[in-house]
Amino acid sequence: GTCAEQATTRDRRLQVPAGSGSLKVWKLGDVIHSTPTVVAGPKDRHDAIYGDQSYSAFLQKWYNRRQVAYVGGNDGMLHAFNAGYYHPGDDASASAPANTTEHGWFTTAPAANSSGAPLGGELWGFVPYELLPQLEFLSRADYQHTYYVDLPLKVADVRIFTADTDHPNGWGTILI
């Protein structure tokens, strides 16, 4: 495009790899103050710290749940990415060379040979209702940077739910 066109439109394309001439659209809004946060199995250990034995059933049920990485972007969305299922290095076979350590690995589904969402693939994006009217600013030629979902995230195991199969004894994990 001409210099005049470039001055009046926002371009979210990048050369990938740099200098290749191949342009790809950068799909994720900038992340400035929102720290990516991974939610894995329950970790608050209310049973051990506070002696609350009602937490144990929740811990056991969700100990090996899918790990999800969350981050807020200045595209107005909270993003959730598949971080997979962790499998510890557990090959005790006689075929392993002596003095070797098998490291753990991540897969897309609980069973090592099954398929699921690709590792690093976006599971979903959520736009808070209050931001919907403001998203139009992103497409304006005179766009000035706006901070949307741009604060650190907090994760906690809490006992606020109605007890059911997904929430043993009312426990669940929330993201704030």
In which residue ranges do the predicted regions lie?
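A fold-level detector for beta-propeller and closely related beta-sheet-rich head/sensor domains
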Residues: G1-I176
